Amino acid sequence: MSLGLLCCGAFSLLWAGPVNAGVTQTPKFRVLKTGQSMTLLCAQDMNHEYMYWYRQDPGMGLRLIHYSVGEGTTAKGEVPDGYNVSRLKKQNFLLGLESAAPSQTSVYFCASSY
């Protein structure tokens, strides 16, 4: 694998219970070349106001990228550079990478809360 590849894994949050996940991420896994763009979808079916996008790099804890406090609102987190977000519907929070860079190789997580 060359350094020119960017691997972005989007993993669903763990949940307790059977079929209904509550929060889901799409796609679950993605590999990009440097400079490519992509969008991750975080969807929740619990009518939550707050939604969050995090990244976790090797050897580090979760770091907040962006968050939303309701439909149509977004705010920057700890590491917002290189990302854009939108929340046009209460149940969906999109995270976009316009031009992927090797520094964005990470595991991405989304979450929601009241």
Curated annotation (Swiss-Prot):
Lineage of producing organism: Eukaryota, Metazoa, Chordata, Craniata, Vertebrata
Residue ranges annotated for the Ig-like domain, each copy included: 22-114
Function according to Swiss-Prot or TrEMBL: V region of the variable domain of T cell receptor (TR) beta chain that participates in the antigen recognition. Alpha-beta T cell receptors are antigen specific receptors which are essential to the immune response and are present on the cell surface of T lymphocytes. Recognize peptide-major histocompatibility (MH) (pMH) complexes that are displayed by antigen presenting cells (APC), a prerequisite for efficient T cell adaptive immunity against pathogens.
A matching Pfam family: V-set
CC terms in the record's Gene Ontology section: plasma membrane; T cell receptor complex
Record InterPro entries: Ig-like_dom, Ig-like_dom_sf, Ig-like_fold, Ig_V-set, TCR_beta_variable
Localization in the cell: Cell membrane
Disulfide pairings: 42-110
Key words of the record: Adaptive immunity, Cell membrane, Disulfide bond, Glycoprotein, Immunity, Immunoglobulin domain, Membrane, Receptor, Signal, T cell receptor
Source organism per UniProt: Homo sapiens
GO biological process: adaptive immune response; cell surface receptor signaling pathway
Protein name: T cell receptor beta variable 6-2
Glycan attachment residues as annotated in the record: 84
